[in-house]
Amino acid sequence: MTINVALASFGMSGRVFHAPFIAQHPQYHLYAIVERHRSDSHALYPDAKLYRSVNEMLQDPAVDLVVVNTPVQTHYQYAKDALLAGKHVLVEKPFDT
């Protein structure tokens, strides 16, 4: 079974840590990336769907797992929204402040 993963952000951690790991792991598929203003991810991951908001991405029924790698003050709300949307969630530390 392949797990469709969505990154909530393509900042430093998304670009340097999360996306490369997900893209190389045989059980994960880098399915979607949220970039609010830019489209930097498209050059590196052209098959990933691009969303402009986390809420828009959460509406996609194909997303299985959401990596919440956004600014700390958004972790709680995005994780809660993803769980309520029926997604599995991985949250970067710290979970909240």
Regions found by a protein language model. Name each.
Residues 60-62:
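Alpha-helix C-terminal capping/helix-to-coil transition sites in glycosyltransferase folds
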Residues 1-45:
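N-terminal Rossmann-like dinucleotide-binding module
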Residues 47-48, 87:
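Short glycine/serine/threonine/alanine-rich loop segments
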Residues 65, 71-72, 76-97:
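Beta-strand-loop-alpha-helix segment that lines the small-molecule cofactor/substrate pocket
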Residues 57, 66:
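Receiver (REC) domain switch-region micro-motif
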Residues 32, 64-65:
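Short, Asp-centered acidic motifs that coordinate Mg2+ and/or phosphate
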Residues 49-53:
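Short acidic-hydrophobic, aromatic-tinged amphipathic segments that line or gate anion-handling sites
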